[in-house]
Amino acid sequence: MIPQDRHRTRCHAHLDARTCEGRDPWGLTVFGPDRLRETSVPLLDWLAGTGASKVAVHFDVDTVDSDEVVLGLGTVPGGLTRAQVHRVIDDLGQHSDVVGLTVAEFIPRDVLALQGMLRGLPLIGS
């Protein structure tokens, strides 16, 4: 089990600001998107303070600003841009050994819509 002070989460833009800054109900350190838009320094400073040298990144795609692209289950405006997410994860890799990367909640909406449209057509079937 990894101690709570060695976890970090990036908050969704739509969550209550009190939840997004400081600590969430589980005691995890959290950063809202506004703290990471311009720089990864707050996250890197926190990481340095933990003493951890290895990092596992769990990337929820709905943290990406839905005004730029909708990758997740719903639309969540105000998140980080794709470039900002890339920078944050790359910066983590420059300052630690990234040993894991998961991508979560990706919904291939276009593929699902196309499958539904084609279902039952000749040569496709059910």
Could you tell me what each predicted segment is?
Residues 1-6, 95-96:
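Active-site histidine-anchored catalytic micro-motif
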Residues 5-24:
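Low-complexity basic/metal-binding stretches
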Residues 20-126:
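Catalytic cores of soluble, metal-dependent hydrolases
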